[in-house]
Amino acid sequence: SFEGGRVTMRRTVKSAPQSIWYGEDRPKYLGPFSEQTPSYLTGEFPGDYGWDTAGLSADPETFARNRELEVIHCRWAMLGALGCVFPEILSKNGVTFGEAVWFKAGSQIFSEGGLDYLGNPNLIHAQSILAIWASQVVLMGFVEGYRVGGGPLGEGLDKIYPGGAFDPLGLADDPEAFAELKVKEIKNGRLAMFSMFGFFVQAIVTGKGPIENLSDHIADPVANNAWAYATNFVPGK
Protein backbone atom coordinates (compact mmCIF):
# COMPACT_ATOMS: atom_id res chain seq x y z
CA SER A 1 0.00 0.00 0.00
CA PHE A 2 1.02 3.66 -0.35
CA GLU A 3 1.14 5.88 2.73
CA GLY A 4 2.46 9.39 2.40
CA GLY A 5 4.29 8.51 -0.79
CA ARG A 6 6.08 5.57 0.84
CA VAL A 7 5.72 1.93 -0.11
CA THR A 8 4.72 -0.26 2.83
CA MET A 9 4.25 -4.01 2.89
CA ARG A 10 2.85 -6.50 5.34
CA ARG A 11 5.09 -8.70 7.42
CA THR A 12 4.85 -12.44 7.08
CA VAL A 13 2.11 -13.55 9.47
CA LYS A 14 3.34 -15.85 12.22
CA SER A 15 1.02 -18.03 14.25
CA ALA A 16 1.10 -21.36 15.99
CA PRO A 17 0.43 -23.86 13.18
CA GLN A 18 -2.12 -26.60 13.81
CA SER A 19 -0.53 -28.87 11.19
CA ILE A 20 0.60 -32.39 12.04
CA TRP A 21 4.12 -31.37 10.96
CA TYR A 22 4.60 -29.10 13.98
CA GLY A 23 4.65 -29.51 17.75
CA GLU A 24 5.58 -32.37 20.05
CA ASP A 25 3.49 -34.96 18.19
CA ARG A 26 4.98 -34.22 14.76
CA PRO A 27 6.49 -37.10 12.73
CA LYS A 28 10.04 -37.96 13.85
CA TYR A 29 13.01 -39.06 11.78
CA LEU A 30 12.62 -42.77 12.66
CA GLY A 31 8.91 -42.74 13.36
CA PRO A 32 8.00 -44.69 16.51
CA PHE A 33 11.60 -45.92 16.81
CA SER A 34 13.05 -42.41 17.18
CA GLU A 35 15.10 -41.68 20.27
CA GLN A 36 14.37 -38.84 22.67
CA THR A 37 14.13 -35.55 20.79
CA PRO A 38 16.61 -32.86 21.92
CA SER A 39 14.93 -30.27 24.14
CA TYR A 40 15.80 -27.42 21.77
CA LEU A 41 13.97 -29.08 18.86
CA THR A 42 10.41 -28.24 19.80
CA GLY A 43 8.72 -28.62 16.42
CA GLU A 44 8.30 -24.88 16.06
CA PHE A 45 9.97 -24.70 12.65
CA PRO A 46 9.19 -26.52 9.38
CA GLY A 47 11.23 -29.62 8.63
CA ASP A 48 12.05 -30.38 12.28
CA TYR A 49 12.01 -34.16 12.61
CA GLY A 50 13.83 -34.17 15.94
CA TRP A 51 17.19 -35.34 14.56
CA ASP A 52 20.37 -33.48 15.49
CA THR A 53 23.05 -36.05 16.34
CA ALA A 54 25.85 -33.50 15.94
CA GLY A 55 24.14 -30.86 18.08
CA LEU A 56 24.26 -28.27 15.30
CA SER A 57 21.02 -26.65 16.46
CA ALA A 58 21.83 -26.39 20.16
CA ASP A 59 22.92 -22.75 19.91
CA PRO A 60 19.91 -20.55 19.00
CA GLU A 61 21.93 -18.12 16.87
CA THR A 62 23.66 -20.91 14.98
CA PHE A 63 20.32 -22.67 14.54
CA ALA A 64 18.74 -19.52 13.09
CA ARG A 65 21.64 -19.04 10.71
CA ASN A 66 21.61 -22.68 9.61
CA ARG A 67 17.85 -22.57 9.00
CA GLU A 68 18.30 -19.56 6.75
CA LEU A 69 21.17 -21.19 4.86
CA GLU A 70 19.25 -24.43 4.41
CA VAL A 71 16.17 -22.75 2.96
CA ILE A 72 18.26 -20.63 0.57
CA HIS A 73 20.24 -23.68 -0.59
CA CYS A 74 16.99 -25.64 -0.95
CA ARG A 75 15.60 -23.00 -3.28
CA TRP A 76 18.78 -22.91 -5.37
CA ALA A 77 18.82 -26.71 -5.51
CA MET A 78 15.22 -26.90 -6.70
CA LEU A 79 15.97 -24.42 -9.48
CA GLY A 80 19.19 -26.25 -10.30
CA ALA A 81 17.54 -29.67 -10.43
CA LEU A 82 14.88 -28.32 -12.78
CA GLY A 83 17.58 -26.76 -14.94
CA CYS A 84 19.42 -30.08 -15.13
CA VAL A 85 16.48 -32.18 -16.31
CA PHE A 86 14.27 -29.78 -18.28
CA PRO A 87 16.62 -29.13 -21.24
CA GLU A 88 17.19 -32.89 -21.61
CA ILE A 89 13.45 -33.54 -21.61
CA LEU A 90 12.91 -30.87 -24.25
CA SER A 91 15.79 -32.20 -26.34
CA LYS A 92 14.37 -35.72 -26.26
CA ASN A 93 11.07 -34.30 -27.49
CA GLY A 94 12.46 -32.59 -30.55
CA VAL A 95 13.54 -29.18 -29.26
CA THR A 96 16.94 -28.26 -30.68
CA PHE A 97 19.67 -27.29 -28.22
CA GLY A 98 23.34 -26.69 -28.77
CA GLU A 99 23.92 -29.00 -25.80
CA ALA A 100 21.13 -30.21 -23.53
CA VAL A 101 23.21 -32.07 -20.92
CA TRP A 102 23.69 -29.71 -17.98
CA PHE A 103 27.40 -30.29 -17.25
CA LYS A 104 28.35 -30.16 -20.93
CA ALA A 105 26.41 -27.04 -21.87
CA GLY A 106 28.74 -24.53 -20.23
CA SER A 107 31.86 -26.05 -21.78
CA GLN A 108 30.71 -24.83 -25.19
CA ILE A 109 32.05 -21.42 -24.28
CA PHE A 110 35.54 -22.83 -24.85
CA SER A 111 34.69 -23.89 -28.41
CA GLU A 112 35.76 -21.82 -31.38
CA GLY A 113 32.34 -20.28 -31.93
CA GLY A 114 31.57 -19.64 -28.28
CA LEU A 115 28.25 -20.35 -26.57
CA ASP A 116 24.81 -19.44 -27.89
CA TYR A 117 22.14 -19.44 -25.21
CA LEU A 118 19.43 -22.00 -26.06
CA GLY A 119 21.39 -22.69 -29.23
CA ASN A 120 20.16 -19.41 -30.73
CA PRO A 121 22.84 -16.94 -31.94
CA ASN A 122 20.26 -14.15 -31.83
CA LEU A 123 20.02 -14.39 -28.05
CA ILE A 124 23.08 -14.13 -25.79
CA HIS A 125 26.34 -15.05 -27.50
CA ALA A 126 29.07 -15.70 -24.92
CA GLN A 127 32.75 -16.09 -25.76
CA SER A 128 34.59 -15.11 -22.56
CA ILE A 129 34.48 -17.28 -19.45
CA LEU A 130 35.89 -14.36 -17.45
CA ALA A 131 33.02 -12.12 -18.55
CA ILE A 132 30.50 -14.80 -17.59
CA TRP A 133 32.19 -15.30 -14.22
CA ALA A 134 32.25 -11.56 -13.51
CA SER A 135 28.59 -11.15 -14.49
CA GLN A 136 27.64 -14.08 -12.25
CA VAL A 137 29.50 -12.65 -9.27
CA VAL A 138 28.07 -9.16 -9.71
CA LEU A 139 24.46 -10.18 -10.33
CA MET A 140 24.25 -12.89 -7.68
CA GLY A 141 26.27 -10.82 -5.23
CA PHE A 142 23.89 -7.90 -5.67
CA VAL A 143 20.80 -10.03 -5.11
CA GLU A 144 22.25 -11.83 -2.08
CA GLY A 145 23.58 -8.58 -0.63
CA TYR A 146 20.15 -7.02 -1.03
CA ARG A 147 18.54 -10.01 0.68
CA VAL A 148 20.93 -10.01 3.63
CA GLY A 149 21.38 -6.26 4.02
CA GLY A 150 17.82 -5.31 3.29
CA GLY A 151 16.49 -2.59 1.02
CA PRO A 152 13.43 -0.41 0.49
CA LEU A 153 11.26 -3.33 -0.64
CA GLY A 154 12.39 -5.68 2.11
CA GLU A 155 12.65 -3.35 5.08
CA GLY A 156 11.20 -4.92 8.20
CA LEU A 157 10.40 -8.23 6.53
CA ASP A 158 11.50 -11.76 7.38
CA LYS A 159 14.71 -12.69 5.52
CA ILE A 160 13.52 -16.20 4.76
CA TYR A 161 9.81 -15.62 4.18
CA PRO A 162 9.46 -11.92 3.32
CA GLY A 163 5.96 -11.92 1.86
CA GLY A 164 4.71 -8.60 0.50
CA ALA A 165 5.86 -7.88 -3.04
CA PHE A 166 7.79 -11.16 -2.91
CA ASP A 167 4.50 -13.07 -2.64
CA PRO A 168 2.41 -11.67 -5.51
CA LEU A 169 0.06 -14.68 -5.47
CA GLY A 170 -0.74 -14.22 -1.79
CA LEU A 171 0.27 -17.77 -0.89
CA ALA A 172 1.13 -16.69 2.66
CA ASP A 173 -2.17 -14.94 3.37
CA ASP A 174 -3.63 -18.01 5.11
CA PRO A 175 -1.35 -18.84 8.08
CA GLU A 176 -2.32 -22.53 8.13
CA ALA A 177 -1.78 -22.99 4.40
CA PHE A 178 1.48 -21.08 4.66
CA ALA A 179 2.70 -23.37 7.45
CA GLU A 180 2.03 -26.39 5.21
CA LEU A 181 3.80 -24.75 2.26
CA LYS A 182 6.90 -24.17 4.41
CA VAL A 183 7.05 -27.89 5.16
CA LYS A 184 6.56 -28.81 1.50
CA GLU A 185 9.29 -26.38 0.48
CA ILE A 186 11.87 -27.71 2.93
CA LYS A 187 11.06 -31.36 2.13
CA ASN A 188 11.28 -30.84 -1.63
CA GLY A 189 14.35 -28.65 -1.19
CA ARG A 190 16.20 -31.32 0.77
CA LEU A 191 15.28 -33.86 -1.89
CA ALA A 192 16.56 -31.45 -4.55
CA MET A 193 19.90 -31.06 -2.75
CA PHE A 194 20.34 -34.84 -2.68
CA SER A 195 19.29 -34.94 -6.34
CA MET A 196 21.94 -32.39 -7.28
CA PHE A 197 24.55 -34.47 -5.47
CA GLY A 198 23.33 -37.50 -7.41
CA PHE A 199 23.53 -35.60 -10.70
CA PHE A 200 27.14 -34.69 -9.97
CA VAL A 201 28.02 -38.31 -9.16
CA GLN A 202 26.25 -39.53 -12.30
CA ALA A 203 28.13 -37.01 -14.43
CA ILE A 204 31.48 -38.17 -13.02
CA VAL A 205 30.72 -41.90 -13.24
CA THR A 206 28.66 -42.25 -16.43
CA GLY A 207 29.37 -39.03 -18.32
CA LYS A 208 25.64 -38.72 -19.03
CA GLY A 209 22.78 -36.50 -17.93
CA PRO A 210 20.07 -37.56 -15.45
CA ILE A 211 17.38 -38.22 -18.07
CA GLU A 212 19.68 -40.37 -20.21
CA ASN A 213 20.80 -42.27 -17.11
CA LEU A 214 17.17 -42.86 -16.18
CA SER A 215 16.38 -44.11 -19.68
CA ASP A 216 19.36 -46.47 -19.57
CA HIS A 217 18.31 -47.82 -16.18
CA ILE A 218 14.72 -48.42 -17.31
CA ALA A 219 15.95 -50.17 -20.46
CA ASP A 220 18.37 -52.44 -18.58
CA PRO A 221 18.18 -52.16 -14.78
CA VAL A 222 20.69 -54.95 -14.19
CA ALA A 223 23.47 -53.39 -16.24
CA ASN A 224 22.75 -49.77 -15.36
CA ASN A 225 22.65 -49.20 -11.62
CA ALA A 226 24.84 -47.93 -8.79
CA TRP A 227 26.37 -51.33 -8.05
CA ALA A 228 27.33 -51.90 -11.68
CA TYR A 229 29.13 -48.55 -11.80
CA ALA A 230 30.70 -48.80 -8.33
CA THR A 231 34.08 -49.86 -9.73
CA ASN A 232 34.34 -46.51 -11.51
CA PHE A 233 35.05 -44.94 -8.13
CA VAL A 234 38.22 -47.04 -7.80
CA PRO A 235 41.29 -45.13 -9.07
CA GLY A 236 42.83 -46.73 -12.13
CA LYS A 237 39.75 -48.70 -13.15
Swiss-Prot record:
<dbReference type="GO" id="GO:0009416">
    <property type="term" value="P:response to light stimulus"/>
</dbReference>
<feature type="transmembrane region" description="Helical">
    <location>
        <begin position="191"/>
        <end position="211"/>
    </location>
</feature>
<feature type="transmembrane region" description="Helical">
    <location>
        <begin position="71"/>
        <end position="91"/>
    </location>
</feature>
<keyword id="KW-0150">Chloroplast</keyword>
<feature type="modified residue" description="Phosphothreonine">
    <location>
        <position position="12"/>
    </location>
</feature>
<feature type="binding site" description="axial binding residue">
    <location>
        <position position="217"/>
    </location>
    <ligand>
        <name>chlorophyll a 6</name>
    </ligand>
</feature>
<feature type="binding site">
    <location>
        <position position="75"/>
    </location>
    <ligand>
        <name>chlorophyll b 2</name>
    </ligand>
</feature>
<comment type="subunit">
    <text>The LHC complex consists of chlorophyll a-b binding proteins.</text>
</comment>
<dbReference type="GO" id="GO:0009535">
    <property type="term" value="C:chloroplast thylakoid membrane"/>
</dbReference>
<feature type="binding site">
    <location>
        <position position="190"/>
    </location>
    <ligand>
        <name>chlorophyll a 1</name>
    </ligand>
</feature>
<feature type="binding site" description="axial binding residue">
    <location>
        <position position="70"/>
    </location>
    <ligand>
        <name>chlorophyll a 1</name>
    </ligand>
</feature>
<dbReference type="InterPro" id="IPR022796">
    <property type="entry name" value="Chloroa_b-bind"/>
</dbReference>
<keyword id="KW-0604">Photosystem II</keyword>
<keyword id="KW-0479">Metal-binding</keyword>
<keyword id="KW-0472">Membrane</keyword>
<protein>
    <recommendedName>
        <fullName>Chlorophyll a-b binding protein 5, chloroplastic</fullName>
    </recommendedName>
</protein>
<feature type="binding site">
    <location>
        <position position="153"/>
    </location>
    <ligand>
        <name>chlorophyll b 2</name>
    </ligand>
</feature>
<feature type="binding site">
    <location>
        <position position="136"/>
    </location>
    <ligand>
        <name>chlorophyll b 5</name>
    </ligand>
</feature>
<comment type="function">
    <text>The light-harvesting complex (LHC) functions as a light receptor, it captures and delivers excitation energy to photosystems with which it is closely associated.</text>
</comment>
<dbReference type="GO" id="GO:0009523">
    <property type="term" value="C:photosystem II"/>
</dbReference>
<feature type="binding site">
    <location>
        <position position="226"/>
    </location>
    <ligand>
        <name>chlorophyll a 6</name>
    </ligand>
</feature>
<keyword id="KW-1133">Transmembrane helix</keyword>
<keyword id="KW-0934">Plastid</keyword>
<feature type="binding site" description="axial binding residue">
    <location>
        <position position="188"/>
    </location>
    <ligand>
        <name>chlorophyll a 4</name>
    </ligand>
</feature>
<dbReference type="InterPro" id="IPR001344">
    <property type="entry name" value="Chloro_AB-bd_pln"/>
</dbReference>
<dbReference type="GO" id="GO:0009522">
    <property type="term" value="C:photosystem I"/>
</dbReference>
<feature type="binding site">
    <location>
        <position position="108"/>
    </location>
    <ligand>
        <name>chlorophyll a 3</name>
    </ligand>
</feature>
<feature type="binding site" description="axial binding residue">
    <location>
        <position position="185"/>
    </location>
    <ligand>
        <name>chlorophyll a 3</name>
    </ligand>
</feature>
<feature type="binding site" description="axial binding residue">
    <location>
        <position position="144"/>
    </location>
    <ligand>
        <name>chlorophyll b 3</name>
    </ligand>
</feature>
<keyword id="KW-0007">Acetylation</keyword>
<feature type="binding site">
    <location>
        <position position="128"/>
    </location>
    <ligand>
        <name>chlorophyll b 3</name>
    </ligand>
</feature>
<keyword id="KW-0809">Transit peptide</keyword>
<keyword id="KW-0793">Thylakoid</keyword>
<feature type="binding site">
    <location>
        <position position="147"/>
    </location>
    <ligand>
        <name>chlorophyll b 4</name>
    </ligand>
</feature>
<dbReference type="GO" id="GO:0046872">
    <property type="term" value="F:metal ion binding"/>
</dbReference>
<feature type="binding site" description="axial binding residue">
    <location>
        <position position="29"/>
    </location>
    <ligand>
        <name>chlorophyll b 1</name>
    </ligand>
</feature>
<dbReference type="GO" id="GO:0009768">
    <property type="term" value="P:photosynthesis, light harvesting in photosystem I"/>
</dbReference>
<feature type="binding site">
    <location>
        <position position="184"/>
    </location>
    <ligand>
        <name>chlorophyll a 5</name>
    </ligand>
</feature>
<feature type="transit peptide" description="Chloroplast">
    <location>
        <begin position="1"/>
        <end position="9"/>
    </location>
</feature>
<feature type="binding site">
    <location>
        <position position="51"/>
    </location>
    <ligand>
        <name>chlorophyll a 1</name>
    </ligand>
</feature>
<keyword id="KW-0597">Phosphoprotein</keyword>
<dbReference type="GO" id="GO:0016168">
    <property type="term" value="F:chlorophyll binding"/>
</dbReference>
